[in-house]
Design a protein with these regions (language model features):
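Structural and coupling elements of P-loop NTPases
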Residues: 1-606
Length: 606
């Protein structure tokens, strides 16, 4: 039997709304940290990439206590590419805290995560965050949230949601904007008042559905989920109901529950608690761990299908192996299959005729995070332009569309509208306030690949663009790609400032002086539409007639530095991104100039 009440809570929101910051404050004020302990921001985001990017990529659990009740808190990703993580978490919690920015209001991903929680019958708590902003409009945002609840078909009970106003960064919450603001006690108390503790079903036959996976080099594959019924014990034999309908025996080797930020090993755990265990080698998302004498599988969790794919190819550039030690097909295959152990939104298929793999995922960020991890682990590979995955519905070709919300200064709104229209976007609404125009669009995913950098340039960095997967719609036709051409290196060597300076009159460079280049490598962006083969390694000829002041150092503009995502968005169909531990290079698929011309002619007739 359980010795305390248990409540499971997920914190959900759009990216950058303050989820991880709120979890930090809840942990701090619940006494998880010692008085002299140094506390880092976004303490749950313990992955290097999460800290660098300031986003949550993997959902994670922690536990706090308030007035004798154990509260398991799940911090979820806010980015649309990881929405399948959020959906699975909904089956393990009793309520959700929905964070909404007091000035931005509901965003595309707010709608997605809220819809998933309402469909599971949960009654959310609305937390209006960042009420200290100068442009806060908390009451108006509450009305917008109510409209969103209604649009998503919320029941009368769900529409009667409690509202908390607060500043997550300062650890403040209040039930009324006029009340004194001290700490998060109003939120803690509201959780206990609003949510019924999970019933003590510890004496029922065991039922536990897997919501997330992990991997430990010593323990092997780890399964995490809430014990819906029964008691889970170390050493006990259980039945596992698999996705294909089969049932297999397994033995629980290790069992962990959350206490604060750490996982504590236990001999047994009870209904309502979120646990992590080892001993089931091939367990997967949605499968049910059942009592040995009473197999009652729970409804299978659907795993969202990928919408985007890239080809991961063996690096065949002249610089292969310079900085990475993991370069072979076998090594890349092993790494991708290891990733599939825990990254269930990923699909990997071998390519025909060439050494490489077609890797499909939920979006550019989903796949670029994997590439960045591999790069840091010492892998080298080349990657093709992202390609949208089409599907046939009733024998009609369909493609993924995304919900897009743009906020841009009024003076740039016309240009943004024109650009989105060219990309087959469909405008749903437009309104202007305080010098900014808010646009809501439905745009094919194809049309958004490579658009973010153009949007930033158009709005001079003053606009924001948020997107999330919406639905599959009938194919919208050819989208005109108006990207300018590129400068392609002619020979192997080091770039010279003299050559780069002369080339800069025709476009922008993406390499610095003294950069190693090879034939077929992209070194700059042409101001015209055609590609141009150039020699960036050419130096100024020496003469004996030079005056003393004629060799002043040339002044070069800073080169354009592509991040991994920007490089993937930028490349054309006949180009690749070469990814190594110490460099990201752009190159043509066919490096030799004569072979490349022949290849391009052949592609015209394909």
């Amino acid at each position: 039997m359980r010795n305390q009440d248990i409540i499971n809570v997920a914190v959900i929101a759009h990216v950058d709304a303050g989820k991880s910051t709120l979890v930090d404050a809840l942990l701090t004020q619940s006494g998880v940290f010692k008085e002299n302990e140094v506390i880092v921001e976004q303490v749950m985001d313990n992955n290097d990439l999460e800290r660098e990017r300031g986003i949550t990529i993997y959902s994670k659990n922690c536990a706090i206590e308030h007035n004798g009740t154990k509260i398991n808190i799940v911090d979820t990703p806010g980015h649309a590419d990881f929405s399948s993580e959020v959906e699975r978490i909904m089956k393990t919690v009793d309520t959700v805290i929905l964070l909404v920015d007091s000035s931005e209001g509901p965003m595309p991903q707010t709608r997605v995560v809220l819809q998933k929680s309402l469909e599971k019958g949960l009654r959310p708590i609305l937390f209006i965050n960042k009420i200290d902003k100068k442009d806060e409009r908390a009451e108006e945002v509450v009305d917008l949230c109510f409209d969103l609840f209604a649009d998503l078909g919320a029941t009368d009970e769900q529409l009667d949601f409690p509202i908390v106003y607060g500043i997550a960064k300062e650890g403040i919450a209040t039930l009324d904007m006029e009340d004194e603001r001290k700490d998060l006690t109003p939120l803690f108390d509201l959780l206990l008042d609003h949510v019924q503790p999970y019933p003590d079903y510890s004496t029922n036959p065991l039922q536990l559905q897997i919501s997330t996976l992990g991997y430990d080099d010593y323990l092997g594959r780890l399964g995490t989920g809430r014990i819906t019924n029964g008691t889970l014990k170390v050493g006990s034999t259980v039945k596992v109901s698999k996705r294909d309908g089969s049932v297999v025996d397994a033995k629980i080797a290790k069992l962990f529950v959350n206490e604060g930020l750490i996982k504590v090993e236990k001999e047994e755990a009870y209904a309502g608690d979120i646990v992590t265990f080892s001993g089931v080698p091939h367990i997967s998302i949605g499968e049910t761990v059942c009592d040995i004498n009473n197999v009652m599988p729970m409804e299978m969790i659907d795993i969202e299908k990928p919408t985007l794919s890239m080809n991961f190819l063996v690096n065949d550039s002249p610089f292969v192996g310079r900085s990475g030690k993991l370069v072979t097909t076998r090594q890349i295959r092993a790494r991708l299959h290891k990733e599939m152990e825990t990254n269930v939104g990923l699909e990997v298929n071998e390519l025909d005729g060439i050494e490489g793999y077609k890797v499909s995922g939920r979006g550019e960020l989903h796949l670029s995070i994997l590439l960045e991890k591999m790069r840091r682990e010492g892998y080298e590979l080349s990657v093709s332009k992202p390609e949208v995955l089409m599907t046939d519905i009733d024998e009609v070709k369909h493609e993924p569309f995304e919900s897009v919300i743009v906020n841009a200064p009024d003076m740039y709104a016309g240009s943004v509208i024109s650009q989105l229209n060219v990309r087959k976007g469909i405008m749903h609404s437009m309104n202007s306030e305080n010098g900014y125009t808010r646009l809501e669009y439905l745009v094919p995913t194809r049309g958004l690949i490579g658009y973010r950098s153009e949007f930033i340039n158009t709005t001079h960095g003053e606009g924001t663009l948020e997107k999330s997967f919406d639905s599959y719609q009938p194919y919208s036709g050819v989208i005109d790609d108006r990207r300018n051409g590129v400068f392609i290196a002619k020979e192997k060597g080091k770039t010279m400032a003299y050559s780069l300076f002369n080339l800069s009159e025709r476009g922008r460079m993406i390499v610095e002086p003294a950069t190693d280049v090879y034939p077929g490598m992209i070194v700059g962006l042409n101001s015209r539409s055609n590609d141009l083969t150039v020699n960036p390694c050419k130096n100024k000829h020496l003469t004996n007639t030079r005056s003393s002041g004629s060799d002043d150092a040339v002044k070069l503009l800073d080169p354009i530095k592509f991040t991994l995502e920007e490089a993937l968005e930028f490349i054309a169909n006949d180009e690749l991104v070469e990814i190594t531990p110490d460099a990201i290079r752009l190159r043509k698929k066919v490096l030799d100039e004569k072979d490349r011309k022949r290849y391009n002619k052949e592609m015209l007739f394909v």
